[in-house]
């Protein structure tokens, strides 16, 4: 996904060397990594042995525009200068070390395995953050793989550092589950701007007859195709899209990136003249999350997932169980899942059309039509993007600040099955191993909201590393049956 709302990672690598070891060990091993790594990376030629070297190297990578850094211990490394790199460089830093085997065991032994221990100890003493991979010691080929894995982690960290979440309206009544203590946002370095629905309505009216509306309408028609949208509704929706985009640009302030969390019912459709879901889907497909029902941490989670996957995402209700007859007809014997491993993820119509089956259409919100239009011919309840979500690998996840002000998270990898839902909305049949147990002992037990963010690939590894880096102490996942949850009854 190409988006100017997601940071571009510009990597640099600095090799470090302890002065009682041959400096050539670090420099040559660094060059070997450069040859193996397939992406773009600035190869800093200053090898750090002391604090003056450190200042020189950091100045060089900054001058080259690097915003993320690899510190490579080609030998034992100088623990003070190498950790001060993280202090003096304003961006995420990964620390990795060289494995032995590319030389003899006399002059060719670097002891970086040992040096990594001193490095981590010094980072801790200085209260500095450094990203250290699961096993940080490797050959040139292995370190190159670690660097590739670091890129999405760095992208998330840089994104959060520059993010502002913009909200419109309070949470709807009886939707307190989407609570949003802002303390957690500030702990993550994220800014928030909270506005009234009236502010949005005023801005929307000011965009009436905007000369750009026709162009947006044409783009909507091209995206959806003939017979898959309401031509008479397009101008209203285009006007709203321009309103949000202009608001984002005018209200970024000191920040580079934005996400929205907007109130979308009950007053919105009757006052704006449509449901905002399709417009929301268009923005998230371009890298700007618009979370439903003022779900601030849903918007935050969506943004994290976009940076982690470098792709668009969605936000869904963990909505309903799969009927036994659908399981028996279309899942049992075809997929290796129990009925309780499956559920339906649903929202009114905010999932990007590029992640939906080809039969998707702009329709009307059935539930709101019952409530607001008495089930009559739909008018202002139109605007939802409906259809089955296309089969895909997925990661279901969320980062949430709970009612006590503590940041917690969960991650579960799975898939959207190629099985018709036979239902309405933007909806799909999801399958996650041991979902039933995860549902009870994580989602229910720990009081998570009913909204979950969805990335359309397996990015659990990246998200886990990101949450660790951010200092999230509780990172839950769908544990296998062989690993019971603390609250799981052993006599069940």
Language-model segment annotations:
Residues 4, 9-11, 40-42, 102-229, ...:
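Cap/lid and interdomain-hinge subdomains that line or gate substrate/regulatory clefts
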Residues 54-66, 83-85, 243-253:
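Short, well-structured alpha-helical segments in soluble
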Residues 66-75, 94-96, 257-262:
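Periplasmic-binding protein-like
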Residues 217, 222-308:
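Long, internal scaffold/assembly segments composed of regular secondary structure
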Residues 2-37:
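N-terminal basic/disordered segments at the start of proteins
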Residues 365-492:
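Extended hydrophobic packing segments that form well-structured cores
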Residues 284-421:
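C-terminal catalytic subdomain
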């Amino acid at each position: 996904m190409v988006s100017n709302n997601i940071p571009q990672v510009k990597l640099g690598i600095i090799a470090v060397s302890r002065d009682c070891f041959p400096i050539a060990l670090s420099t040559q091993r660094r060059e070997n990594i450069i040859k193996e790594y397939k992406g773009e990376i600035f190869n800093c030629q200053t090898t750090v042995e002391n604090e003056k070297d450190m200042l020189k190297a950091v100045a060089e990578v900054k001058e080259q525009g690097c915003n993320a850094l690899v510190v490579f211990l080609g030998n034992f490394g100088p623990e003070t200068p190498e950790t001060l790199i993280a202090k003096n460089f304003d961006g995420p830093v990964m620390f990795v070390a060289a494995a032995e085997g590319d030389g003899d065991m006399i002059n060719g032994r670097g002891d970086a395995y040992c040096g990594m221990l001193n490095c981590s100890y010094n980072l801790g003493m200085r209260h500095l953050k450094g990203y250290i991979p699961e096993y940080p010691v490797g050959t040139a080929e292995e370190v190159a793989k670690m660097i590739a894995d670091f890129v999405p982690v760095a992208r998330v960290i840089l994104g959060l550092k520059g993010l502002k979440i913009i909200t419109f309206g309070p949470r709807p009544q009886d939707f307190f589950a989407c609570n949003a203590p802002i303390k957690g946002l500030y702990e993550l370095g994220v800014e928030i701007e909270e506005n009234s629905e009236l502010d949005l309505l005023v801005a929307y009216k000011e965009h009436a007859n905007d000369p750009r509306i026709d162009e947006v309408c044409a783009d909507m028609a091209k995206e959806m195709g003939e017979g898959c949208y309401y031509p008479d509704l397009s101008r209203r929706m285009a006007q709203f899209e321009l309103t949000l985009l202009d608001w984002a640009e005018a209200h970024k302030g000191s920040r580079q990136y934005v996400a929205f969390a907007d109130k979308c019912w009950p007053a919105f459709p009757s006052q704006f003249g449509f449901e905002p879901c399709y417009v929301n889907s268009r923005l998230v497909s371009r890298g700007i999350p618009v979370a439903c029902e003022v779900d601030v941490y849903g918007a935050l989670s969506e943004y994290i997932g976009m940076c982690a996957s470098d792709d668009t995402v969605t936000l869904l209700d963990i909505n309903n169980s799969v009927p036994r007859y659908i399981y028996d007809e279309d899942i049992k014997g075809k997929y290796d899942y129990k009925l309780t491993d499956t559920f339906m993820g649903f929202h009114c119509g905010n999932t990007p059309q590029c992640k939906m089956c080809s039969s998707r259409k702009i329709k009307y919100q059935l539930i709101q039509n019952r409530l607001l239009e008495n089930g009559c011919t739909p008018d202002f309840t139109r605007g939802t993007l409906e259809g089955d979500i296309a089969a895909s690998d997925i990661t279901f996840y969320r980062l949430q600040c709970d009612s006590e002000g503590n940041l917690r998270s969960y991650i579960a990898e799975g898939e959207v099955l190629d099985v018709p839902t036979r239902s309405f909305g933007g909806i799909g049949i999801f399958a996650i191993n041991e979902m039933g147990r995860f549902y009870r002992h994580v989602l229910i037990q720990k009081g998570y909201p009913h909204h979950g963010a969805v990335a359309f690939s397996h990015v659990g590894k990246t998200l886990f590393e990101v949450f660790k880096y951010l200092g999230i102490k509780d990172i839950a996942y769908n544990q296998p049956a062989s690993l019971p949850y603390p609250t799981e009854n052993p006599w069940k």
